[in-house]
Amino acid sequence: MLFQSTAARSDAPRRKHIPTALGGLRKEKAVGSDLNRYFSQMGAHVKVLEGKSPGRRWGISGSREEAPRIVLDIRRDQHGEYFEIRTGPGGRQEIVVLNVEPRERHLLLLSRQFGEREQFLAKQKFLCGHDERHWFVAAIPENEPVSTVAGAKIALKPEGVRTREGLLGISRKASFQRRNRAFIRQGEWFFVPAALEADPRLVLRNEPLSRGNGGKPHWAEECYRSGGDTVYVSARYPSGLTAEEYKKLPASERNSGFHIMKRDAAVYVRGKMSHPDHETVTLHGWHRVLMNTENRSSAMRFLAFLD
């Protein structure tokens, strides 16, 4: 599902603000070309498919009212990776590019949905960009009033990371790097140095870290968990079942590839952290694992993209 991007034009401005809406997809055919223009400024391709149901491939079910009216994904064709935006049937969509950072290869996208009677329904914001090796999409929490790429990046940082940056006096420039004195980042995971004495008997080796959405896990050379709830995880139940929920399953299903994990535990890792889409990082000493704030966003269910 992935593509070789073309380089952003060298004469492109460093920062672009696009304060006005690009228009409703149903009403203005120019929207598609405008999206192509803004995505191309960061070296990406985009395809917009209007009036298309998310379908089974996105793993989304429920009534028409419950179904997302927009779904974003990273797909791949013969030319490589591209962004795919699908808008559901019924009502009207507006897609607004709020900010483009060509040199950083990021943009902030706003989606607004209207009903068949033109009543406002909902809005979501998505950070689209390139991180290390591939394009990505991240949903921004709805309670974060961001209008720029920089603001979106800050909004995706967990509170513990923001607090530590403030205490250490991390500069704004350094705060956007993948590694500084406050943290090391790999994809959606932040690793914060921690003073910890772990019981060697409880240290796990070659342990997967997953946010439970079916994406590819990050692998920790050494992992230590403290607290949290014991859950039973399988391909069908990636977010895990409690012991009570697990016991209610038929015996045949309970024997179908479940393994026991901890949910909402304090997680610490040490050594090498690896992931096929990211550069391997080495953590010297124990680090607390914090996930970005994307899971606070209801718009996260509108993403088919899984890291």
Regions found by a protein language model. Name each.
Residues 3-102:
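Short Lys/Arg-enriched alpha/beta "domain-start" segment
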Residues 166-274:
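Long, positively charged binding patches that form subdomain-scale interaction surfaces
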Residues 262-277, 282-302:
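Tight coil/turn sites that cap or link beta-strands
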